[in-house]
Structures are given as structure tokens and as C-alpha cells.
Amino acid sequence: MKVKDFDFYLPEELIAQHPIEKRDEARLLVLDKETGEIEHKIFKDILDYLTPNDCLVLNNTRVLPARLIGAKEETGGKMEFLLLKRKEKDVWETLVKPGKRAQIGARFIFGNGELKAEVIGMGEEGSRIVKFYYEGIFEEILDQLGQMPLPPYIKEKLDDKEMYQTVYSKEEGSAAAPTAGLHFTEELLKKIEEKGVKLAFLTLHVGLGTFRPVKVEDIQEHVMHSEYYKMDKKTAEIINDTKENGGRVIAVGTTSCRTLETIGAIEGKVGEQSGWTDIFIYPGYKYKVVDALITNFHLPQSTLLMLVSALAGRDNIMNAYNVAVEKEYRFFSFGDAMFIK
């Protein structure tokens, strides 16, 4: 299969630049994966499509305000740091711009000097290994000095950092939000539980690889970046019970979906587990755990568009996307949602 098989026309004005005020009032396109039938709803109507035997699996990762603006100690030149992956307590793999100013031994200063950094090594694909120096708790300093690392297609500044976090976010470590979860409010989750639907939480820390374009023509040649995940015993039991009782395992977002399929890759059963996944799901893949998916609208030619095509069929997905464009749905991270049932 070719990457160009997953292209579609998207007018730029349909790329959502900011979240809507009420999370659960985004639009919802409901797609029947068997028939290709489409319905147009509001996100909170998701309640009508859930049954007491079902289980919603949500990713409770929390986005780090991982974008730091600082200066080179020697020259005062402005620098931008993006934290990618923690290597040790104070050592991070980091993207540094401009890279030519960030040679080994270069030192940098942030804020009023409460955070300092030194490049101690070179990482993959032009990244730098950086050691940070500070007093106190790193996360608290990052909270004061850091900015949200919004995707490159969002040009507007975010007024409230919490709008780029899910209401159930808990485990810090992501470079991007698991955006399907942004549509849930505490009130909606309560109503879902009152209906008898189980909520199960896992963690996958989203890396920047999620925004990297596919650069090969043949999708089978694409290599995914690995991301850290973990699932506890309680969540595994809820998912296995749901399967045994004939309910649906509904993944909230492609991150939950990829984690479930990684852990359940052997025989569809899941267990307590943590590790790194680079699973790449595209048409031809047979889902082992996930029965249905709540997700946003993805970029043309992206691995996430391939993942949803593997669940609902490429033709059904491409048709639904063309309908979404025609009906002026909002796309990408702050956009509207789709329920593939």
C-alpha cells in the first residue's frame, strides 16, 4: 500500500486553532465500520452509543510544558529547547534550536537563572543529550518556565494550559496530548459510569514522532518511534472481564488503541505490563483487543489515518473524511471527534 492512498483534500481553515469552550459540545461523526453508514451528532451523545457491558479505555498521560525558551550563557543568543525523553533524573534527550549553537559543553540559562542546562552528548536525528541544574523540584520549575509544546499546525497561543490536558490526566511525561480524550468532561464521565460502562486507565507517553510525516512511498517501509506505556493489573482485569462478558473494548484515542494492541498481541488477553512500543497499525492488521474507537480527525497521509483505516476499512474512512470536509468538521488536535463503532 502506498502513502498516497491515504491522501485527502483539507482546506486550511478546517484545522482547529483553539479548543471549543465546552469540551463535550464538539461535533461527533459516528461511523459504522461494517456498513460505512454515517451519523452526525454532538460529542456528549456518545452516551447513547454505549451499553452497560462496554468498557472505555483512557490514556491518563499528562503533557509536560516541555518547551523552554532560554539563552546561551556565553553570548545571550535566544534558544528553544523541547524535552523529548527523560534519560536519567536530570538528563533529557532534547531538540535544541538553533542546533549549531548547541555543541557539547555549551551552557544555557532559563528564566532568571533558576534553571540552567549543559549539552553533554548528541542524540538521535540531531537531538541533544542535556543535563539540567536547578534547586528544588524540576517539575515545579518546568511548570513556571515551560510552555505547552503545541503541534506545528496550531499557530495561535493557548490561553489556558489545562485546555491541552484531559480532565483525567495524571502521569506526567507526554510531548503531546492524547487528543480524543480532550472531549470528556467530569460530568460526562460520571454519566457514562452511571450507565454501567466501566472506565479503565492506562498510560502511553506521546512522543513527537506522532507529528512526524511518513517519508517513504510504501507504508510497510515506515518505522515508528517508540513510546513508553504501562498498564496495571486492575485495568487488565476490567478489559479481560469485558471481553468475557461479551462487551466492547472501546479505545479512547489512538494512543490507548496502540497500547491495547501491543499488550494483547498474543491472544487478545491483556495483563499488567510496561515497556516501549513501536507498533504500526495499517490496513491488513487484524485487531486483537479493540472493538471500537473514539478518535479525532487525523492528518492526510499520517500513520494515525492508516490505523483507523485498519479498523473501519480504507474506503469507509476516506469516504467519512470527505463527508467531514464537506460538512466543515474541525480537524486535528483541537478539532471534532469520530466514533468508529
Swiss-Prot record:
Q: Which reaction does it catalyse?
A: 7-aminomethyl-7-carbaguanosine(34) in tRNA + S-adenosyl-L-methionine = epoxyqueuosine(34) in tRNA + adenine + L-methionine + 2 H(+)
Gene Ontology biological process terms from the UniProt entry = queuosine biosynthetic process; tRNA wobble guanine modification
What would be an example GO MF term here?
S-adenosylmethionine:tRNA ribosyltransferase-isomerase activity
InterPro entries according to UniProt: QueA (IPR003699), QueA_dom1 (IPR042118), QueA_dom2 (IPR042119), QueA_sf (IPR036100)
Disulfide connectivity for this sequence is none
Q: Which UniProt keywords apply?
A: Cytoplasm, Queuosine biosynthesis, S-adenosyl-L-methionine, Transferase
This protein's record includes keyword S-adenosyl-L-methionine: yes
Instruction: Write out the transmembrane intervals.
Output: none
- Location of this chain's protein in the cell: Cytoplasm
Query: Is this entry keyworded Transferase?
Result: yes
The protein's predominant localisation is cytoplasm
Q: What does this protein do?
A: Transfers and isomerizes the ribose moiety from AdoMet to the 7-aminomethyl group of 7-deazaguanine (preQ1-tRNA) to give epoxyqueuosine (oQ-tRNA).
**Which HAMAP family did the record assign?**
QueA (MF_00113)
What is the protein's name according to its record? Answer: S-adenosylmethionine:tRNA ribosyltransferase-isomerase
